[in-house]
Amino acid sequence: MADQKILDKISKLLALSESDNPNEAAIALERAQKLMKEHSVTMTDVSLSAISEHNESIPTILKDGRLYTLLGDIISRSFGVTFLVISKHNNSRTAISGVCFIGPNDRIETAGYVFTVIARQLAIAKKNFLASYRSKLLEEMIEYFTSIGYIRDPETFRKTCTSLPKLYKSFFYIKSSCESRLRQATKAYLRGWLSSVSQKIDDFVYEEQETLLIEQYIQATYPHLRELRQHSVRFNREQMSHYHKGIKDADDNVNLFRGVTGDMHRRELGFKS
Protein backbone atom coordinates (compact mmCIF):
# COMPACT_ATOMS: atom_id res chain seq x y z
CA MET A 1 0.00 0.00 0.00
CA ALA A 2 1.18 3.54 -0.72
CA ASP A 3 2.64 5.87 1.88
CA GLN A 4 0.02 7.39 4.19
CA LYS A 5 0.98 10.90 3.06
CA ILE A 6 0.20 9.97 -0.53
CA LEU A 7 -3.11 8.44 0.48
CA ASP A 8 -4.01 11.55 2.47
CA LYS A 9 -3.15 13.76 -0.50
CA ILE A 10 -5.31 11.65 -2.83
CA SER A 11 -8.19 11.77 -0.33
CA LYS A 12 -7.99 15.57 -0.20
CA LEU A 13 -7.91 15.81 -4.00
CA LEU A 14 -10.93 13.53 -4.31
CA ALA A 15 -12.76 15.71 -1.80
CA LEU A 16 -11.90 18.78 -3.89
CA SER A 17 -13.16 16.97 -7.01
CA GLU A 18 -16.66 17.33 -5.57
CA SER A 19 -16.33 21.12 -5.55
CA ASP A 20 -19.11 23.27 -7.00
CA ASN A 21 -16.45 24.88 -9.20
CA PRO A 22 -16.27 22.66 -12.33
CA ASN A 23 -12.72 23.67 -13.28
CA GLU A 24 -11.39 23.18 -9.78
CA ALA A 25 -13.16 19.82 -9.50
CA ALA A 26 -11.79 18.60 -12.84
CA ILE A 27 -8.21 19.57 -11.99
CA ALA A 28 -8.42 17.92 -8.56
CA LEU A 29 -9.83 14.70 -10.04
CA GLU A 30 -7.14 14.60 -12.72
CA ARG A 31 -4.39 15.03 -10.11
CA ALA A 32 -5.92 12.36 -7.88
CA GLN A 33 -6.14 9.87 -10.76
CA LYS A 34 -2.55 10.62 -11.76
CA LEU A 35 -1.28 9.96 -8.23
CA MET A 36 -3.34 6.78 -7.96
CA LYS A 37 -1.88 5.45 -11.20
CA GLU A 38 1.64 6.53 -10.28
CA HIS A 39 1.54 4.76 -6.90
CA SER A 40 -0.72 1.82 -7.88
CA VAL A 41 -3.44 2.97 -5.49
CA THR A 42 -7.02 1.72 -5.72
CA MET A 43 -10.17 3.38 -4.42
CA THR A 44 -10.31 0.69 -1.74
CA ASP A 45 -6.83 1.74 -0.59
CA VAL A 46 -7.97 5.35 -0.40
CA SER A 47 -11.12 4.45 1.53
CA LEU A 48 -9.22 2.24 3.98
CA SER A 49 -6.72 5.04 4.64
CA ALA A 50 -9.47 6.72 6.68
CA ILE A 51 -9.33 3.76 9.10
CA SER A 52 -6.45 3.16 11.48
CA GLU A 53 -5.74 1.80 14.94
CA HIS A 54 -4.67 3.02 18.36
CA ASN A 55 -3.22 0.79 21.07
CA GLU A 56 -3.54 1.20 24.82
CA SER A 57 -1.88 -0.94 27.45
CA ILE A 58 -4.18 -2.58 29.98
CA PRO A 59 -3.71 -1.05 33.46
CA THR A 60 -3.28 -3.37 36.42
CA ILE A 61 -6.79 -2.45 37.56
CA LEU A 62 -8.19 -4.14 34.43
CA LYS A 63 -6.24 -7.40 34.52
CA ASP A 64 -9.49 -9.25 35.15
CA GLY A 65 -10.62 -10.20 31.63
CA ARG A 66 -14.23 -9.33 32.30
CA LEU A 67 -13.24 -5.77 33.22
CA TYR A 68 -11.23 -4.84 30.14
CA THR A 69 -13.81 -6.38 27.81
CA LEU A 70 -16.58 -4.46 29.58
CA LEU A 71 -14.65 -1.20 29.29
CA GLY A 72 -13.62 -1.92 25.70
CA ASP A 73 -17.28 -2.46 24.83
CA ILE A 74 -18.25 0.83 26.52
CA ILE A 75 -15.67 2.74 24.46
CA SER A 76 -16.56 0.96 21.21
CA ARG A 77 -20.26 1.69 21.59
CA SER A 78 -19.70 5.33 22.44
CA PHE A 79 -17.17 6.19 19.73
CA GLY A 80 -18.25 3.93 16.90
CA VAL A 81 -15.01 1.95 16.85
CA THR A 82 -14.07 -1.71 17.22
CA PHE A 83 -11.69 -3.06 19.82
CA LEU A 84 -9.39 -6.07 19.76
CA VAL A 85 -7.45 -7.62 22.61
CA ILE A 86 -3.67 -7.75 22.15
CA SER A 87 -1.94 -10.86 23.48
CA LYS A 88 1.69 -11.86 23.83
CA HIS A 89 2.86 -15.46 23.71
CA ASN A 90 5.62 -16.51 26.08
CA ASN A 91 6.52 -20.19 25.77
CA SER A 92 3.23 -22.00 26.39
CA ARG A 93 1.53 -19.07 28.11
CA THR A 94 -0.55 -16.30 26.60
CA ALA A 95 -0.71 -12.94 28.36
CA ILE A 96 -3.09 -10.09 27.54
CA SER A 97 -1.07 -6.90 27.18
CA GLY A 98 -3.39 -4.29 25.72
CA VAL A 99 -6.36 -3.33 23.61
CA CYS A 100 -6.44 -2.02 20.06
CA PHE A 101 -9.14 0.41 18.93
CA ILE A 102 -9.86 0.36 15.20
CA GLY A 103 -11.93 2.98 13.44
CA PRO A 104 -11.93 6.39 11.74
CA ASN A 105 -8.73 8.38 12.29
CA ASP A 106 -10.53 11.25 14.01
CA ARG A 107 -12.00 9.05 16.77
CA ILE A 108 -9.61 6.29 17.76
CA GLU A 109 -7.11 8.43 19.67
CA THR A 110 -9.87 10.01 21.73
CA ALA A 111 -11.32 6.54 22.32
CA GLY A 112 -7.97 5.39 23.70
CA TYR A 113 -7.70 8.47 25.90
CA VAL A 114 -11.15 7.92 27.39
CA PHE A 115 -10.32 4.23 27.97
CA THR A 116 -7.43 5.40 30.16
CA VAL A 117 -9.53 8.06 31.92
CA ILE A 118 -12.24 5.59 32.90
CA ALA A 119 -9.61 3.07 34.03
CA ARG A 120 -8.16 5.72 36.36
CA GLN A 121 -11.59 6.48 37.77
CA LEU A 122 -12.10 2.76 38.29
CA ALA A 123 -8.79 2.56 40.16
CA ILE A 124 -9.95 5.30 42.54
CA ALA A 125 -13.25 3.49 43.09
CA LYS A 126 -11.37 0.25 43.79
CA LYS A 127 -9.07 1.94 46.31
CA ASN A 128 -12.00 3.44 48.21
CA PHE A 129 -13.96 0.19 48.17
CA LEU A 130 -11.03 -1.88 49.42
CA ALA A 131 -10.34 0.53 52.28
CA SER A 132 -13.97 0.33 53.38
CA TYR A 133 -14.32 -3.42 52.94
CA ARG A 134 -11.05 -4.22 54.73
CA SER A 135 -12.26 -2.26 57.77
CA LYS A 136 -15.61 -4.05 57.65
CA LEU A 137 -13.96 -7.47 57.33
CA LEU A 138 -11.56 -6.72 60.18
CA GLU A 139 -14.45 -5.81 62.48
CA GLU A 140 -16.38 -8.90 61.37
CA MET A 141 -13.44 -11.16 62.24
CA ILE A 142 -12.88 -9.50 65.62
CA GLU A 143 -16.55 -9.95 66.50
CA TYR A 144 -16.41 -13.59 65.40
CA PHE A 145 -13.33 -14.46 67.47
CA THR A 146 -14.82 -12.59 70.42
CA SER A 147 -18.05 -14.62 70.14
CA ILE A 148 -16.18 -17.94 70.32
CA GLY A 149 -13.96 -16.80 73.20
CA TYR A 150 -10.64 -16.39 71.34
CA ILE A 151 -10.63 -12.65 72.07
CA ARG A 152 -11.57 -11.80 75.65
CA ASP A 153 -11.09 -8.03 75.58
CA PRO A 154 -12.17 -6.81 72.13
CA GLU A 155 -11.76 -3.12 72.92
CA THR A 156 -8.12 -3.54 73.91
CA PHE A 157 -7.56 -5.89 70.96
CA ARG A 158 -8.93 -3.29 68.51
CA LYS A 159 -6.41 -0.71 69.71
CA THR A 160 -3.45 -2.90 68.76
CA CYS A 161 -4.96 -4.80 65.83
CA THR A 162 -5.78 -2.02 63.38
CA SER A 163 -5.48 -3.88 60.07
CA LEU A 164 -6.05 -7.29 58.53
CA PRO A 165 -2.29 -8.06 58.24
CA LYS A 166 -1.99 -7.54 62.00
CA LEU A 167 -4.99 -9.81 62.54
CA TYR A 168 -3.34 -12.50 60.42
CA LYS A 169 -0.38 -12.52 62.81
CA SER A 170 -2.72 -13.62 65.59
CA PHE A 171 -4.93 -15.87 63.46
CA PHE A 172 -2.75 -16.83 60.48
CA TYR A 173 -5.13 -19.56 59.27
CA ILE A 174 -7.82 -17.05 58.21
CA LYS A 175 -5.56 -15.16 55.79
CA SER A 176 -6.37 -17.31 52.75
CA SER A 177 -10.14 -17.11 53.18
CA CYS A 178 -10.12 -13.37 53.96
CA GLU A 179 -7.94 -12.52 50.96
CA SER A 180 -10.18 -14.65 48.74
CA ARG A 181 -13.24 -12.77 49.97
CA LEU A 182 -11.48 -9.48 49.29
CA ARG A 183 -10.63 -10.48 45.73
CA GLN A 184 -14.11 -11.77 44.91
CA ALA A 185 -15.82 -8.78 46.52
CA THR A 186 -13.62 -6.37 44.58
CA LYS A 187 -14.29 -8.11 41.26
CA ALA A 188 -18.04 -7.98 41.88
CA TYR A 189 -17.89 -4.31 42.89
CA LEU A 190 -15.85 -3.23 39.85
CA ARG A 191 -18.09 -5.11 37.46
CA GLY A 192 -21.10 -3.42 38.98
CA TRP A 193 -19.38 -0.04 38.65
CA LEU A 194 -18.67 -0.59 34.96
CA SER A 195 -22.18 -1.92 34.41
CA SER A 196 -23.53 1.41 35.65
CA VAL A 197 -21.18 3.39 33.38
CA SER A 198 -22.28 1.22 30.45
CA GLN A 199 -25.91 2.19 31.05
CA LYS A 200 -24.98 5.89 30.83
CA ILE A 201 -23.56 5.55 27.32
CA ASP A 202 -25.43 6.60 24.18
CA ASP A 203 -24.55 4.21 21.38
CA PHE A 204 -22.80 5.76 18.39
CA VAL A 205 -24.86 5.57 15.20
CA TYR A 206 -22.70 3.75 12.66
CA GLU A 207 -22.74 4.51 8.97
CA GLU A 208 -22.91 1.31 6.90
CA GLN A 209 -19.91 2.30 4.77
CA GLU A 210 -17.85 2.97 7.87
CA THR A 211 -18.71 -0.43 9.34
CA LEU A 212 -17.68 -2.16 6.11
CA LEU A 213 -14.37 -0.29 6.03
CA ILE A 214 -13.57 -1.31 9.62
CA GLU A 215 -14.34 -4.93 8.77
CA GLN A 216 -12.14 -4.76 5.66
CA TYR A 217 -9.30 -3.20 7.65
CA ILE A 218 -9.47 -5.96 10.28
CA GLN A 219 -9.59 -8.72 7.65
CA ALA A 220 -6.59 -7.25 5.83
CA THR A 221 -4.51 -6.47 8.91
CA TYR A 222 -5.47 -9.31 11.27
CA PRO A 223 -6.43 -12.32 9.11
CA HIS A 224 -5.82 -14.83 11.91
CA LEU A 225 -7.93 -13.40 14.72
CA ARG A 226 -9.17 -15.76 17.40
CA GLU A 227 -12.27 -15.32 19.52
CA LEU A 228 -11.65 -14.52 23.17
CA ARG A 229 -13.64 -16.96 25.27
CA GLN A 230 -14.87 -16.02 28.71
CA HIS A 231 -16.70 -18.03 31.30
CA SER A 232 -20.01 -16.84 32.70
CA VAL A 233 -19.85 -15.33 36.17
CA ARG A 234 -22.07 -16.21 39.11
CA PHE A 235 -22.12 -14.25 42.35
CA ASN A 236 -23.17 -15.48 45.75
CA ARG A 237 -25.41 -13.32 47.91
CA GLU A 238 -22.54 -11.37 49.49
CA GLN A 239 -20.81 -10.77 46.15
CA MET A 240 -24.08 -9.65 44.60
CA SER A 241 -24.43 -7.01 47.31
CA HIS A 242 -20.98 -5.68 46.35
CA TYR A 243 -21.99 -5.72 42.67
CA HIS A 244 -25.02 -3.55 43.48
CA LYS A 245 -22.88 -1.25 45.60
CA GLY A 246 -20.62 -0.73 42.58
CA ILE A 247 -23.67 0.19 40.51
CA LYS A 248 -24.90 2.63 43.15
CA ASP A 249 -21.52 4.31 43.64
CA ALA A 250 -21.11 4.88 39.91
CA ASP A 251 -24.72 6.07 39.64
CA ASP A 252 -24.10 8.61 42.41
CA ASN A 253 -20.58 9.75 41.55
CA VAL A 254 -20.03 9.42 37.80
CA ASN A 255 -21.63 11.74 35.27
CA LEU A 256 -20.64 11.48 31.64
CA PHE A 257 -20.70 14.41 29.28
CA ARG A 258 -19.83 14.53 25.64
CA GLY A 259 -18.26 17.26 23.53
CA VAL A 260 -18.52 17.56 19.78
CA THR A 261 -15.75 19.37 17.90
CA GLY A 262 -16.53 20.66 14.43
CA ASP A 263 -16.93 18.22 11.56
CA MET A 264 -14.74 15.63 13.23
CA HIS A 265 -17.57 14.60 15.58
CA ARG A 266 -15.05 14.07 18.31
CA ARG A 267 -16.88 12.45 21.22
CA GLU A 268 -15.31 12.95 24.60
CA LEU A 269 -16.40 11.50 27.90
CA GLY A 270 -15.60 13.31 31.09
CA PHE A 271 -16.33 12.84 34.75
CA LYS A 272 -18.06 15.10 37.21
CA SER A 273 -18.06 13.92 40.79
Locations of regions flagged by a protein language model:
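Long alpha-helical, hydrophobic tracts
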Residues: 1-57
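Extended, helix-rich structural scaffolds rather than catalytic motifs
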Residues: 3-4, 45-273
